[in-house]
Amino acid sequence: MPELPEVEVVRRGLERGVVGRTVAEVEVHHLRAVRRHLAGADHFAASLVGQTVATARRRGKYLWLGLTPSEPGGPAVGDALLGHLGMSGQLLVVPADSPDQVHLRVRFRFTDEGRELRFVDQRTFGGLAVVSGGAELPAPIAHIAPDPLSVDFDPERFADALRRRRTGLKRALLDQTLISGVGNIYADEGLWAARLHYARPTETVTRAEALRLLDAVRTVMTAALAAGGTSFDRLYVSTEGVSGLFERSLEVYGRGGQACSRCASTIRRDAFMNRSSFSCPACQPRPRRVR
């Protein structure tokens, strides 16, 4: 699933490709793509026609396009087109005459008749919805915490909240109400960089260790963002269809059985929450008590 760096790459592409443009037509090719828009596909499309895209924003793994209020004297805050990429979602800005992708789910045409926006999703776990009055922050994601690269993220509050949890470190990092945008890849990479085991009980972590972990996650995510994100199977691509290159820089994730670049020990792969965790047994010693 795309995590913060990948979603931010897409957000930047949307900012370049669709902000300032007015929606002329919306085609819904697969109802599951708009299942979160409870009023239905026809209402979804009608809600967007004539709307101008004012902003492209993100919180954690969610994206939204803030729309300009369309009626004089109407609400001061516009609606939002809220999206989540799920496991395989892509938002592509492509020439209008380019062939349709096999898994095209929603098409957006604009009044300038330039490049169109397409939502493509092979596994259909992603989705789009229009949120009334949600241009600043859509209500369905208001409970999600700021992400570690956000200017309003509070490191001290994070450290205190982390240490009050009664869970394992990686479970805490995946909790989007504590810190958003971190998924399996960057949790493993951040924990390796901070030399902390994923099952370490959060209540045993010192303030200094919590801040070190946060700094490690930020550093890894910043590097991933600079590389265009991580692409394993080409399901994640930018709005231009370009894969990320950070896979080449991963230290532990997906490298079970290989040598740790820091100490040459063999990287472990453990089952974790119906997925996998990768760690170095020497650099990240397993605590006696785990969660």
From Swiss-Prot:
This protein's name: Formamidopyrimidine-DNA glycosylase
SUPFAM superfamilies for this protein: Glucocorticoid receptor-like (DNA-binding domain) (SSF57716), N-terminal domain of MutM-like DNA repair proteins (SSF81624), S13-like H2TH domain (SSF46946)
Similarity comment text for this entry: Belongs to the FPG family.
Keyword terms of this UniProt record: DNA damage, DNA repair, DNA-binding, Glycosidase, Hydrolase, Lyase, Metal-binding, Multifunctional enzyme, Zinc, Zinc-finger
Catalysed reactions, as listed in the record: Hydrolysis of DNA containing ring-opened 7-methylguanine residues, releasing 2,6-diamino-4-hydroxy-5-(N-methyl)formamidopyrimidine; 2'-deoxyribonucleotide-(2'-deoxyribose 5'-phosphate)-2'-deoxyribonucleotide-DNA = a 3'-end 2'-deoxyribonucleotide-(2,3-dehydro-2,3-deoxyribose 5'-phosphate)-DNA + a 5'-end 5'-phospho-2'-deoxyribonucleoside-DNA + H(+)
Zinc finger (FPG-type): 251-285
Annotated residues for binding of DNA: H103, R123, R165
Species of origin: Parafrankia sp. (strain EAN1pec)
UniProt gene name: mutM
Single Gene Ontology BP annotation: base-excision repair
Known partners and oligomeric status: Monomer.
MF GO annotations: 8-oxo-7,8-dihydroguanine DNA N-glycosylase activity; class I DNA-(apurinic or apyrimidinic site) endonuclease activity; damaged DNA binding; zinc ion binding
Alphabetized InterPro entries for the sequence: DNA_glyclase/AP_lyase_DNA-bd, Formamido-pyr_DNA_Glyclase, FPG_cat, MutM-like_N-ter, Ribosomal_uS13-like_H2TH, Znf_DNA_glyclase/AP_lyase
Catalytic activity, EC: 3.2.2.23, 4.2.99.18
Active site feature: P2 (schiff-base intermediate with dna), E3 (proton donor), K61 (proton donor), R275 (proton donor)
Cofactor requirement: Zn(2+)
Purpose: Involved in base excision repair of DNA damaged by oxidation or by mutagenic agents. Acts as a DNA glycosylase that recognizes and removes damaged bases. Has a preference for oxidized purines, such as 7,8-dihydro-8-oxoguanine (8-oxoG). Has AP (apurinic/apyrimidinic) lyase activity and introduces nicks in the DNA strand. Cleaves the DNA backbone by beta-delta elimination to generate a single-strand break at the site of the removed base with both 3'- and 5'-phosphates.
Keyword presence, ATP-binding: no
Details of cofactor binding: Binds 1 zinc ion per subunit.
Domain of life: Bacteria
Protein's UniProt keywords contain Cell membrane: no
